[in-house]
Amino acid sequence: MDLPPALLSFYCPIASEVSPEHEAVAQEMYAWIHAMSLTSDNRQAKMLAQAGAGFNSYFTPRARGELARALSKYNVCAWIANGMVQEIRDPGTFGAMAARWARIMEEPATCPADGIPMDFALADAFSHIRRTLSPVKWQHFSAAQSHWMHGLAWENCLHQVKGLTVHDYLSFRYVMSGCFAAAAFAYAVPERHPSAEEWAHPKVRAAADAAMMVDALDNDRYSYLKESLTEADKKTIFAALRHENPALGREEVIVRGVQLRDRILTLYLTLRGELLCDASEGLRSYLTGLDLIIAGNLVFCADMGLRYGLPEGSVRTDAEPLDRTVAPPGIGAIDHWWAQAGA
């Protein structure tokens, strides 16, 4: 399939970093995956180990030592859970599992004695994370990840829905893709974090939400080819745009999706610049963490390109956005972010 040039050309003026511990952590994750009986397939175990360590190495490259290993365990579990959304078609069955996992994330001791391997793996991962974080960081992180489980349950229910508007898609994507959950990594990893007042400031929240929505829309771009070839019933920004505008051709749908993503990234860069003018050390660390997640997502998905069926070298960065518009896009689900620019 010929891919429109805009699909895999990513505007991103943010530098990425890579953890020097990647290979060591990946080897440990491979052994842990087998110890937790998450798979008996060595090839699958190797892929999961690289994915789990890769999330840490590219998204949170400054997490080292025990924290890197604890987060990588969770990343493995998150990868598996995300895949199960498509495999289990009964919302009741998946919802029951997601609810159990959400509670294990909040309190690992609730893991049932007769649970499945995924239950035990999550309990081990979150017990490990709890030991490495301060109580404040732990509560923040575990609550955010539990929140993501609700999004996965929603996504599983959407198998029964034919189409979503762009507004509804972005509202659901915020939770399903883990925007709130992903930003929690930027809070957990640095030694210093923003105060409660700084973190809750509307401009900080708008910046974090916009940053993580960029990641979510980038993931739609990475998975486009694989889902087109398999005819997967996956809700994406492109499917939502086509649902609202059935007459649009494939390339125009992709261009509009990329333009929306670039407008959101442009807004994030504006909000970040305003916040950095008088930011505390903790807030600066948080914003740097958001930067690393955005840039790291590009490196990670290029590295994991085979999973998405992408041709080698097809992921590119671009110095210019497809859309420089500074006004809100007229989508109720996200327009309020723009109100914080200049506020």
Curated annotation (Swiss-Prot):
Keywords, comma-separated and alphabetical: Lyase, Magnesium, Metal-binding
Similarity field: Belongs to the terpene synthase family.
Lineage: Bacteria, Bacillati, Actinomycetota, Actinomycetes, Kitasatosporales
Pfam family, one: Terpene_syn_C_2
Entry GO MF terms: metal ion binding; terpene synthase activity
Residues reported to bind Mg(2+): 219, 223, 227
Needed co-factor(s): Mg(2+)
UniProt xrefs under InterPro entries: Isoprenoid_synthase_dom_sf
E.C. number: 4.2.3.150, 4.2.3.149, 4.2.3.151
Reaction(s) the record says it catalyses: (2E,6E,10E)-geranylgeranyl diphosphate + H2O = (R)-nephthenol + diphosphate; (2E,6E,10E)-geranylgeranyl diphosphate = (R)-cembrene A + diphosphate; (2E,6E,10E)-geranylgeranyl diphosphate + H2O = (1S,4E,8E,12E)-2,2,5,9,13-pentamethylcyclopentadeca-4,8,12-trien-1-ol + diphosphate
Signal sequence coordinates: none
Function: Diterpene cyclases that can form multiple diterpene products.
Complex and partners: Homodimer.
Species: Streptomyces sp
Name under which the protein is recorded: Diterpene cyclase DtcycB
UniProt keyword Repressor, yes or no: no
Domain of life assignment: Bacteria
